[in-house]
Amino acid sequence: MYIVGIDIGKNHHEASIVSPEGKQIGRSLRFATTHKGADSLMSFIFKNIGNSPCVFGMEATGHYWYPIYSFLKAKGYTIYVINPIQSDSLRKMYIRQTKNDSIDSFLIAEVIRFGQFGTTSMADENILAMRQLCRYRDSVISSRTEIKLRIGTIMEQIFPEYEKQFSSLCVSTSMGILEKYLTPENIENAPIDELFEIIKDKSHNRLTKAKAISIKEAAADTFGIKIAQDAFSFQLKQLIDRMNFLDKQIEALDCQILEYYEKFDCYLHTIPGIGMIAAATILAEIGDINRFKSSSALVAFAGIDPTVRQSGEFSSTHNHMSKRGSPYLRHAIFLVATTCSFHNSPLNAYYKKKRDQGKHH
């Protein structure tokens, strides 16, 4: 059977046809990532091999392979999507260390011809949608974290004593006060009862009037910068507005993600320490777990498998994680593993066992 290797690019792809014996048929084709370009690929194949059966191979390069994969899948073709590391390994076997799109598409076809490869596939539509939302949520969380850091930088300059009043600068009570008053001068001049009402409301009656008094005293005695107050307060107002907007986005995202998660018969969230969103993220990244031949394959997919360093009789005992798999899955696993280690569960017991064996956190 003929093999069509496709080197994936953002605006153009490159295709090469290889015979079952490993001979390239004709020259490679460069085609645009459009309907017209995909049609030219079909014409190119027919011109070179007619209606002979063929399969396709391509690398999982970012998200750029999705459209051509969908196009070919709709036409009933078999498509093998491989990890770029696999074709890179074959490239290193060639004497000429050349890399261009034409050679890459040929090498991708060769990987498929040799048959020594693992495949990636387009996920179920609901899994794909949930994965997109979870990854987008991750980027929104990162943006919010950056804003929190910038708020902290401003407060360290204009009111360095303020953060010590709370467990964290950006807790609800703290942000409620800053949103209303912005500067230490405004806090100092605020009526005590008005300030306390904000504190009482945002803390759900957990904090007393003593906290309002303490904050006002700190504002009156602050060692913060006194100049350019208007510029600092303007920045602070914009940053708080942006953070409030992102909070609303995250809330809406969570609702969307949970709608998809509830479509699956998944019980990850029943494990103590794993929340619904974390469970959805893990499920979205793994997809159909049956596509992994073993637990080791799943561990490698997450990139938490240890690297192996051996030479002759030497074997390293200080190996690190490969970090070659999905960074989103790896991050989610790290977070839930940390949380689970604090809960009374079998995972906590296993964590303590490993710590007792001398393993680091």
Where are the language model's segments positioned?
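A detector of single, family-specific signature residues
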Residues: M1-H361
